[in-house]
């Protein structure tokens, strides 16, 4: 296994940390030490520790599950070191040992140890990757859910927390009472305006606990928004074995990620920050324009490729993008429907971003399932396609490619590809009646599905007729016959 001792004798093809591993100190506490965090935030911090050694990371796991206990044991055995293999679309890989994570605590085993770190003045940022659903926002009301059982328990016994909200707010309470400074609360989850979501969640909890404390947090802590991006696949036992064989390491915690990585972060920090710009982080006043580019090109591009790709019979994204017809349709969608109606952020060319999207989809080492990308298509269409569709209708642009995308989505919901294969399409927001509507031969009624609510207030008559016509072509002649010229 990898340890501080084995750092002295790494294989020649493996990069060691470029700093004194014994000379770095924590400046960040991070909740939710998953693969994405280890390949993203920790990756950026890794690169600045040589210049700023007081910004290492203490990781915290919140659950006491057997899996969490095993992870804690593995981190401890390896001195929190692990390998990261970065793989380019060409197949070329680089391997480095990561040392930015200096400690890992399992919160249920020692809650006070976690609070001790959080209260330490040396900790100036508390970050998290707790998933989109982890912020405990009620989907109906849009407010922090105070009915959550774990939240209720923390509010009843706030000095002995179990949730991330309880830990962070209790730590800020102790800092305030000691006359100390607040820290920055930094979400690194892959959701729009993640800082605003975090702010709503933590202040929602704090207000329920103590309105005066909530006011102090609101005035002293900051919650910067950030846009994060890097494909980091799950590492199975088989993949771990292959990674170790290629690197020559004996690593119980290996990671693999694409060579592409991006982090655009609002420069709003309450108590100092590491020089992340030296590692390539783009520090900006507002991340909105970058979020729009990612949503309308990368995320929308994914489903634009996968809906028809599934119908043709492709199971993996990298195989679908190699199909010249599907690739051509995606390129036309980006070039003709998205780029002309999208604002490029400073320092970015939309054409360059388009090329990176196509390249990333073709990376076989990052292969992803088309069905996974297409799952919950209703929600994804609402978020990823709506702005482009609205612009096209309002500006009276050609609707053919958009109609083809919608027709492909509706045909995909039938669960049968052109080769006769069957599959299960996942639409968790649809009830039984909506699922039947999607699979019925009544093409017009299917356009009433909630996936298309984002542009229902506009005149959609032309778009609707094109969708109906293209569904007929797909049924009679196949997907490729329906692809617009």
UniProtKB/Swiss-Prot annotation:
Enzyme class of the recorded protein, top EC level: oxidoreductase
Keyword list, A-Z: Cytoplasm, NADP, Oxidoreductase
Single annotated GO MF: oxidoreductase activity, acting on the CH-OH group of donors, NAD or NADP as acceptor
Classification via InterPro entries: 6-PGluconate_DH-like_C_sf, 6PGD_dom2, Mannitol_DH, Mannitol_DH/Oxidoreductase, Mannitol_DH_C, Mannitol_DH_N, NAD(P)-bd_dom_sf
Keyword Protease set for record: no
Protein location: Cytoplasm
Main location (coarse class): cytoplasm
Protein name (record): Polyol:NADP oxidoreductase
């Amino acid at each position: 296994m990898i340890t501080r001792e084995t750092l002295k004798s790494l294989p020649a093809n493996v990069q060691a940390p470029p700093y004194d591993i014994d000379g770095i100190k924590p400046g960040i506490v991070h909740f939710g030490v998953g693969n994405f965090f280890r390949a993203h935030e920790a990756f950026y911090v890794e690169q600045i520790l040589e210049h700023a050694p007081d910004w290492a990371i203490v990781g915290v796991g919140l659950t006491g599950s057997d899996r969490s206990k095993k992870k804690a044991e593995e981190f401890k055995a390896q001195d929190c070191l692990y390998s990261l293999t970065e793989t380019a679309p060409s197949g070329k890989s680089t391997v480095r040992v990561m040392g930015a994570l200096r400690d890992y605590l399992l919160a249920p085993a020692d809650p006070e140890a976690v609070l001790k770190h959080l209260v330490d003045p040396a900790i100036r940022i508390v970050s998290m990757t707790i998933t989109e659903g982890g912020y405990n926002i009620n989907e109906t009301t849009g407010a922090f859910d105070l009915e959550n059982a774990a939240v209720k328990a923390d509010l009843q016994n706030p000095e002995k927390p179990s949730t991330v909200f309880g830990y962070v707010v209790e730590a800020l309470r102790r800092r305030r009472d000691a006359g100390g400074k607040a820290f920055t609360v930094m979400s690194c989850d892959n959701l729009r305006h993640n800082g605003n979501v975090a702010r709503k969640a933590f202040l929602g909890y704090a207000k329920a606990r103590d309105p005066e404390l909530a006011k102090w947090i609101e005035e002293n802590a900051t919650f910067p928004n950030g846009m994060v991006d890097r494909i980091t696949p799950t590492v199975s036992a088989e993949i771990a074995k292959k990674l170790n064989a290629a690197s020559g390491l004996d690593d119980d915690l290996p990671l693999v990620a694409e060579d592409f990585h991006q982090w655009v972060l609002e420069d709003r920090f309450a108590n100092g920050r590491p020089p992340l710009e030296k590692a390539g982080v783009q520090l900006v006043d507002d991340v909105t324009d970058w979020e729009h580019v990612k949503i309308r090109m990368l995320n929308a591009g994914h489903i634009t490729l996968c809906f028809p790709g599934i119908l043709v019979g492709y199971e993996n994204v990298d195989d679908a993008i190699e199909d010249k017809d599907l690739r051509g349709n995606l390129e036309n969608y980006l070039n003709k429907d998205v780029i002309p109606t999208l604002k490029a952020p400073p320092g970015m060319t939309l054409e360059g971003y388009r090329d990176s999207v196509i390249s990333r989809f073709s990376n076989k080492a990052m292969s992803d399932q088309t069905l996974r990308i297409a799952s919950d298509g209703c929600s994804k269409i609402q978020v990823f396609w709506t702005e482009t569709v609205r612009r096209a209708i309002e500006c009276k642009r050609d609707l053919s490619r958009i109609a083809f995308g919608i027709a492909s989505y509706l045909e995909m919901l039938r669960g049968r590809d052109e080769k006769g294969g069957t599959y299960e399409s996942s639409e968790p927001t649809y009830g039984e009646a909506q699922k039947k509507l999607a699979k019925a031969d009544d093409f017009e009624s299917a356009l009433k599905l909630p996936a298309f609510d984002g542009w229902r207030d506009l005149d959609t008559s032309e778009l609707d007729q094109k969708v109906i016509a293209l569904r007929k072509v797909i049924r009679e002649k196949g997907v490729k016959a329906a692809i617009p010229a």
